[in-house]
Amino acid sequence: MKVELSKVPILGKDVVHVGFDIADHIVDTIFQSCPSSTYVVINDTNVEKIPHYVDLCGELQAKLKSGSRILQYSVKPGEAHKTREQKAAIEDYLLSEGCTRDTVIIAVGGGVIGDMIGYVASTFMRGVRVVQVPTSLLAMVDSSIGGKTAVDTPLGKNFIGAFWQPQFVFVDIKWLETLPKREFINGIAEVIKTACIWNAEEFARLEENADLFLQVVNGSKTTQVSVQGQVHELSLTNIDAMLEHVYRLVLESIKVKTHVVSSDEREAGLRNLLNFGHTIGHAYEAILTPQALHGECVSIGMIKEAELSRYLNILSPTQVARLTKILAAYGLPISPDQKWFKDLTLNKKTPLDVLLKKMSIDKKNDGSKKKAVLLETIGKCYGTSAHVVSDEDIRFVLTDETLVYPFKTLENGQEKTIVPPGSKSISNRALILAALGEGTCKIKNLLHSDDTKHMLHAVQQLKGATITWEDNGETVVLKGHGGSTLQATAEPLYLGNAGTASRFLTSVAALVNSTSSQKSVVLTGNARMQERPIGPLVDSLRENGISIDYLNKEKSLPLKINTDSNFKGGRIELAATVSSQYVSSILMCAPYAEEPVTLALVGGKPISKLYIDMTIKMMEKFGIYVKASTEEPNTYHIPKGHYVNPPEYVIESDASSATYPLAYAAMTGTTVTVPNIGFESLQGDARFARDVLKPMGCSVTQTETSTTVTGPPVGGLKPLKHVDMEPMTDAFLTACVVAAVAHDGKEGSRNTTTIEGIANQRVKECNRILAMVDELAKFGVEANELPDGIQVHGLSSIDKLKVPEAIHSYDDHRVAMSFSLLAGMVGATKDALSEPVRILERSCTGKTWPGWWDVLHTQLGAKLDGSEPLQSAVKKNSNSSIVIIGMRAAGKTTVSSWCANALGFKFLDLDTVFEEQYKKGSVKEFVAEHGWDAFRATETKIFEESVKKYGEGYVLSTGGGIVEGAASRKSLKQFASQGGIVLHLHRDIDETIKFLNSDPTRPAYNEDIRNVWERREEWYKECANFTFYAPHCTSSTQFNQLRKTFETFIRTISGKREVKIPTNRSSFVCLTFDDLAAHKEKIPDITAGCSAVELRVDQLKSYDLDFVAKQLSILRLASSSLPIIFTIRTKSQGGQFPDDDKSTLGSLLSLALEVGVEFVDMELTLSSELQYSLVNNKRNTKIIGSHHDFDAKFDWNDSEWENRYNQALSLDVDVVKFVGTAKDFEDNLKLEQFRLQHTAKPLIAINMTDVGKMSRVLNTVLTPVTSSLLPSASAPGQLTLSQINEIYTLLGGFSAKNFYVVGSPISHSRSPVLHNTGYKILGLPHKFEKFETSSASEVKDKLLSKCKLGGLAVTIPLKLDIMEFMDELSESAKLIGAVNTVIPLGDGKFKGDNTDWLGIYNSFLANGVPENVRGNSGFVIGAGGTSRAAVYALHQLGCSDIHLVNRTVEKPHDLKKSFPSEYNLHVLEDSQQAEGISGSVALAVSCVPADKPLDDNLLARVRAVLAKAQGTSFKPTLLEAAYKPAVTPMMKTASDEFSWHIIPGSQMLVHQGVAQFQLWTGFRAPFNAIYSAVTEEQA
């Protein structure tokens, strides 16, 4: 297909040329119209990969005239390079090439290139000619036209620039062939915008072609092209398939912009109409960039600004609905809360205050006043420029939570006429009848809502009718085909929460014809829709020959209707006591049955008979006459036939919706008229004013077609003793809120209004009766349910209405609209300012009255505001309870108690709760008496009650079979989906079976245990969002290690422990074992000095999920919970994992998140699906975005790295890791330049090969290293940590520092051997020596003045004296009152710290003591300096009380006075006090000299306290602070007499020294080697 070349004038010149494949024309025009000595083509490096660019440059070169030259300059792609610095670099290049004022610059690229190069042209030589060749849709229709040029600054986009009109803008649509799909759709937003503000005809054309566009763009394919010897992957779209459409949309959009620019070049007024959608859109973009694109944010902005126009009573709801529909149809977001868009933007929050702040710096604002472009109708703006809008109104449209203020601002005698939207009931019936009918029918006043949108879409999917629009979208035109064209579709009919549509379409589906490839239709909806009943209708259709399957829950959607089965007709019996819609559904489809239908309604009195009458009357209008049986009650005869569509059908306004403005009049004492609903209405709810409001004290005037209500003075409504609302069940909610403020004035009266006949309201969008009871209670209004109704007990005064907590709408339009009325009555009669009432989910009113809030605000005068959403009850890092699931004997009870202890939660075993409720023995006895099924049902009930009752601050341990029940699984998944933790505790199944077979206390399974596991395994995975693999422990050491590992794990996944990215020089070691089990003893030495450890999953011998989980468990235990980097390196990225096994890869990456690893390496070459799955489900895990160039394809200046870096930023990874391949040494220098220019995220950037080793030395964050203990390095050129440090030292990166231990006597000090061992192993150049002195002044004079001082270890007697020379003190040093560590700060300043307490604290942790020992007391023996550190450490461990004993009693009292009262220190002066201690003492620290006999009095008190160790969840533990002798008298007493676990003093010594080492060097010390060196020396 060919399209003609079009020239569009701007400012009087034919500047814009639009065509397809016009490279020849571009070149000829430039050379003919812009003669020059120098032409400079400037583009970004991405464009160079496109063949069309090569063709264009080739044409320029081939046709260049003699005496002229062509230069070419490339810039790096992306907004990050649209800077003043880049502009200067371009200008320097032009100057260096001798470019003069006759230069012509040709800008080839997207918006970034066009903006920046235009600005270069505007200032170079005071202005040179520029030609724009836009290559993206957005640039073609927007940025290239109009002469706006700019660069970005750190403070904002486009803040520095100029207006500089190009000589030409060449729009060659061929560029769009290689535009990626998302970029294509992104540009469409601006196209829709221009049509929306200026060209209604083009807007309608865009509506008609939306399906074609999305079909073609979604069909784009990736292809490989060779450009100048290099192969590149490009997206390729078949533009030919929609060339006419794309050409037109580009051309028409350009015409709008050129016209506006020609009228207002400098944006004095008219031109800012082009900013429709941008005021709010730019605010979203500022927060969501770079994940969200400009057009995507403008799309959301257009919706919000259209809603703002509707809110201000300027734009009709129909026009908003059209705009919403077209944006969605072109694949653009219409709300920031759409799941796919939230996933794309990584679930970033868009806080209301931040959005408003971003809007405040919009260039078109009037000072502090915000301006927005308002829409009058599709194709026309309101006025000729942007309008000032209030923050209050903006806030309202930006949020789904609204604040309703008291109705105080009403005019006296206010009279309003309100026209509600078309009836939902009539709208849906009319659409079905017209679709089944023959001929064209124009339907007017159709309700434009979610329900009707789903119905229209379904009719189109089934090919039931041809649908067009007239009157600018206000009138829908259906050309029905008499049902003959109904056709099965493979795509499920998604109906949201549209109950009416679902019921009507179930019968319509029975008339659908099969195709050769499709034999069924599937109806589905949202979660609530899949709970609502449809059973009676399905039963009747099944009995009539229609084959229907439930695909999920019985009696609810989704349904699968077999289209090969026929609707036979004849007698049909239907239970109609739940919903009249079942009846209407069969009635409307009955004429198309094979035989005439007799429909008998059975099972009791039919509900809502007036709606059945409505259907029958409407069928008459379409030519089918239904006769009621004269012989049988509630029975109808429907003849065979075809509907004949009337030329026009006008939908009556919705009578249910009309109840809200009428009730508003009743409650506020004002007058409201609804002009198109009267007593002749088809709808039962038209009776509401006459049968409900009038008896309650209102004046009601009703004609055939109108209803007027005037309320009594405020507070004058009377309760209604009894009303049967069966003819108008939907209106009962409105009646309830009116009744809430109705009273009879009698003292002691309950002011009761009784409403009956509404049982069907329990199965609507929610259980409406219960919802009204619950939400009325929040206002202080009592209500109670009746079998088929509700009683509301009104308040004696409106002043008694309470300001409730947030009102929940249950995603139910009628609940929200009803409570919007009662909300305004709170405080309405009080003079003082009253708080507003918050209503949640306000947008649910879109189901029937999208503009209800606009009417309430603009027409009825209510004050509304928007508000930041309340936080969900269950949030990450909250005290949300944790549920633990797993097989019997997995260790749930033990681990749950650890979990509770670590988090400070309470522990609840649901088996224990069961036994308490059962009160007849154990679970085993219950099962023996009642069976497993009864137990499961009871267990599920208890679980659901417990989750609700103990939702915060608890650890709930469940029975192994909790996942057997579907209801329990649903509750577990719901809890997890709200941010709660459901933890699957997993053990080796063989070990579990072995244990269970030997345990007689548990009820026996009726089947093989392994079979039970195999059945439950998937259920555990389905319900849990975290997994912990607990290996079998064979010793107390392993058990303690497991506890410590678990506590670190649970604190990490719950957010109590932050995963930190190192900020100093750091490294991780890359493990290359194929199975860690045989090498776990080596892991502590392999990981020495490293900040993390990488598990190369691709190098493991098996990718089985259980095997990998075990490997992770081994690694956690062996490395003492060192942060794990989980890496699966694919073959294309230099690893061993198959590139094509995406399924296993996805499962393994999911496992990584489920087991809570600290880091996941995510290759930037993975599919978008996997990448977004990772980043959106990462929880507390950090993501490393990695890219490797093993084949040395890309120089560090190549755009590949820039594009990958921008990709990493758009994915918002936590760390970027780039690995190149060095061919020569200069590659390292280029890498360092790249590192300097890319600082937005922590960057690991290295080169492989021996030549690239230097880059590993210079890398700062998380450098990958190997170890001599590993079988091989994981990459070419990889170094050990000590090698890196040694080379870095040789380069001057590390300066040798001198460290000293100071004090006296220190001849036996182990500090030098401790620290020097660490320095040697890690390759550090430092030296540690002794400096013996008793004078702090001497230390100051001789050591603190040394320039190479690295730090001091301070011992007796200087721990107090040295403090006067410190400039800063750590919190621990202040409270302990002593310094044992001096840290130089530079400039002659020093910080004093204390690591003695860490020596004590970490020694306890290393010996199985949990991080928090809540409920247990501590014990300190002695009252010297070390005792102070012991007190501090025990408090940090969570000891509830700390008991002190000393040989003399004065010193411990002094010690007690120096600590805060919350430490709960108790001095035990005698044995009687010691024996009187209540509670358990679990930790003790001995700080008395070990080389002298113990005082008898002191020993007696010690023994009394040690005897108090009872009932702890860990073995009571005593730490001996003295490290000589190896076994002290105190150690023997505690161990031999009281069986306490003993920690020798050498451990405290090493732990406090290791803490110093890490403070001074920043490196994690090699603990095992240091400990061996210290203890060997000691021996």
From Swiss-Prot:
Q: Region 3-dehydroquinase: which residues?
A: 1071-1283
Pfam families annotated for this entry? DHQ_synthase, DHQS_C, DHquinase_I, EPSP_synthase, SDH_C, Shikimate_DH, Shikimate_dh_N, SKI
- Record note on cofactor: Binds 2 Zn(2+) ions per subunit.
Binding residues for 7-phospho-2-dehydro-3-deoxy-D-arabino-heptonate: 126, 142, 148, 158, 190-193, 257, 271-275, 278, 294, 363
Cofactor needs: Zn(2+)
Q: Is Cell division one of the keywords UniProt gives this record?
A: no
What is this protein identified as?
Pentafunctional AROM polypeptide
Q: What species does this protein belong to?
A: Lachancea thermotolerans (strain ATCC 56472 / CBS 6340 / NRRL Y-8284)
Q: Gene for this protein?
A: ARO1
